[in-house]
Design a protein with these regions (language model features):
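Active-site rim helix/loop that mediates acceptor-substrate recognition in acyltransferases
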Residues: 21-54
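Conserved GNAT acetyl-CoA-binding A-motif
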Residues: 100-121
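Short amphipathic alpha-helix that is part of the acyltransferase structural core
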Residues: 1-33, 149, 160-168, 175, ...
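Conserved catalytic-core motifs of GNAT/GCN5-like acyltransferases
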Residues: 117-119, 124-148
Length: 191
């Protein structure tokens, strides 16, 4: 799997924007891709395009993550709809995690424990992360009324590091209250 750093002028940006809007509901897109592209040089982040080894010029997906001192928060990861269930997502995801080495990697995904119209999709996403080596931390966040499970790449969740990371992110935002806060629930996260 080939990962390419994407910039606002990259030829695949229009395909990325289309995938961004298709893959994530509006409630999970508090900022536009244009806003993300404008901040690429201003915050410690990575926007990576995913390309198969066999067809290195074929845009297949993307990852957007924000780097902390010793961590990475995966904000968005998606593969093209026509490539889903082909194994490319798992290969790409493992390549992305490998790209960051021994860094603690965090992702959050919609909780399947809430009533929702996309319950089946939520369960598929959850299983994807668990199948690819992530661990549920027992912690949750809420963004725009939707509950998310926080998962990490290591068995032990660095909660203090996560909170420090979120506080640093909030310091640079015009509306720091928009960032999700950690909380626990009384439900067991069954694997």
């Amino acid at each position: 799997m080939i990962l390419k750093k994407l910039t606002p002028n990259h030829p695949d940006i229009s395909a990325l924007k289309k995938l961004f809007e298709e893959a994530f509901p509006e409630s999970e897109r508090p900022v536009s891709m244009d806003t993300i592209l404008n901040y690429l040089d201003q915050i410690p982040c990575d926007l990576l395009g995913v390309y198969p080894d066999e067809t290195p010029d074929e845009f297949s997906g993307f990852f957007f993550g924000i780097r902390g001192e010793s961590s990475v928060y995966g904000v968005y990861f998606a593969t093209r709809p026509d490539l889903r269930s082909t194994g490319i997502g798992g290969k790409a995801f493992r390549a992305i995690v490998e790209h960051y080495g021994d860094t603690q990697f965090w992702f959050s995904y919609e909780s399947p424990f809430e009533e929702s119209e996309n319950a089946e999709q939520r369960e598929r996403r959850r299983n994807f992360y668990l199948r690819n080596g992530f661990h549920e931390t027992g912690w949750f966040t809420k963004l725009n009324g939707t509950e998310f499970i926080v998962a990490c790449s290591k068995e032990e969740f660095d909660k203090e590091g996560f909170e420090k990371f979120m506080a640093a992110m909030a310091a640079g935002l015009p509306n720091p209250q928009a960032l999700p806060q950690l909380y626990r629930r009384d439900i067991a996260c069954e694997k």
